[in-house]
Amino acid sequence: MRILQALKKYTKFVEQFTNQSQTESKIEAEHIFMFVLNVNRPKLYEQFNNTLTNYNNKKIEDILELRKNKPLSYILKKHTFYKDEFYINDNVLIPRPETESIIDEVIRQGDLLFKEKQKCIFLDAGTGSGCVGITIANQRPEWKVLLLELYSEAIEVAKINLKLCKKNNIDLIRSDWLKPIANNSFDF
């Protein structure tokens, strides 16, 4: 079977068991194919006329079987948030799309309140994967970002994402919410 035919077939399959729109199902199926074939979207499209190997077809079917009971981000161990890819596992929550608008608002408010040369300090309490704080740090490298998390499993996920982002304006602290930082001040 050609990759394009398989993609259409599995898009319908995703649509049936997730109750997503056809567009959402196609995007999800494309993510599965990109993961299995280890390609980006343009490369996937270039390969539409290639034959899908039995091995890769089986891998796709295995992922789809898991997908019946588990979000795709947990299966693939990654999630795109605000144009960046983050490591995710079931020890942290999957970032929601509407959280991206919070990022936009924090940046907008921060830009209004602080000049370029001033340092803004952003606290991400209960950071989980760290995607919110890391995204802020990526968008505003002149700001200081503090990630706060209590659970060691989530801290491990945040550490992986910190290594991937390679920013020096972020600190990660294991803490029971605000106890050790009570005497500090934060802008957001």
Q: Where are the language model's segments positioned?
A:
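Short, Lys/Arg-enriched, disordered terminal segments
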Residues: 1-17, 108-119, 182-183
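N-terminal auxiliary segments of SAM/dcSAM-dependent transferases
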Residues: 1-79
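Structured loop/turn residues at beta-strand edges in well-structured enzyme cores
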Residues: 27, 168, 184
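Active-site catalytic microenvironments for nucleophilic, acid-base chemistry
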Residues: 35, 39, 109, 139, ...
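SAM-dependent Rossmann-like transferase core, predominantly class I methyltransferases
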Residues: 59-140, 145-160, 174, 179
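Short, conserved SAM-binding/catalytic segment
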Residues: 158-170
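A short acidic, Gly/Pro-enriched loop at the edge of an enzyme's catalytic core
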Residues: 179-188
